[in-house]
Amino acid sequence: MAVTKIYIVYYSLHGHVETMAREVLRGVNSVPDVEATLWQVPETLPEKILEKVKAVPRPDDVPDIRPEQLAEADGFMFGFPSRFGVMASQVMTFFDNTNDLWTTQALAGKPAGIFWSTGFHGGGQELTALTAVTKLAHHGMIFVPVGYTFGKSMYEMGEVKGGSPYGSGTYAADGSREPTELEIQQANYHGKYFAGIAKKLKKRSPV
């Protein structure tokens, strides 16, 4: 059986989304005949600003991705922090540079999922996801939400938990809060669930 290639493309300023991305990677790679690759969205902020906001160093083992490289994959998981209810400007800029792919609809019919980090309740856990879907729609990609398939943990009220039916998520608070065990579990499940859907779509594709 042909391998289904999933690109996990993320941007992380303080490390929270990176943590989620690596767990999504484990989930995707747990599905037979599916292979995931981690990619970073290029940074757009100058070093002086990054130092001021105490950005964590970018990992050396995850290369930056160029827009045209998206065409190589069978599906995508995009991860990003929220800024004022939308994806961070670095990810916005990356999508703005996919015009050539949009012109040819090179990504049409390919599945895509999303995961994210916000500061607090009301910081965009669902709004960020909803606004991100517009990028996928204009490319003709198939949005794959996680729904409530994660089970009873989706209804957890005993602790703070990010994520929603749109995808997995976490809260960063002032930057000191790290993804919880439950959020990590959901990210892993999300990757596994998405990989299963992407694999089915590739198998049924006439191309």
From Swiss-Prot:
GO terms for cellular component: plastid. Residues 6-194 form the Flavodoxin-like domain. InterPro entries: Flavodoxin/NO_synth, Flavoprotein-like_sf, Flavoprotein_WrbA-like, FMN_Rdtase-like_dom. The keyword Cell wall biogenesis/degradation does not apply. GO terms for molecular function: FMN binding; NADH:ubiquinone reductase (non-electrogenic) activity; NADPH dehydrogenase (quinone) activity. Disulfide bonds: none annotated. NAD(+) binds at residue 14. Belongs to the WrbA family. Catalyzes the transfer of electrons from NADH and NADPH to reduce quinone to the hydroquinone state. This is Probable NAD(P)H dehydrogenase (quinone) FQR1-like 3. It comes from Arabidopsis thaliana (Mouse-ear cress).
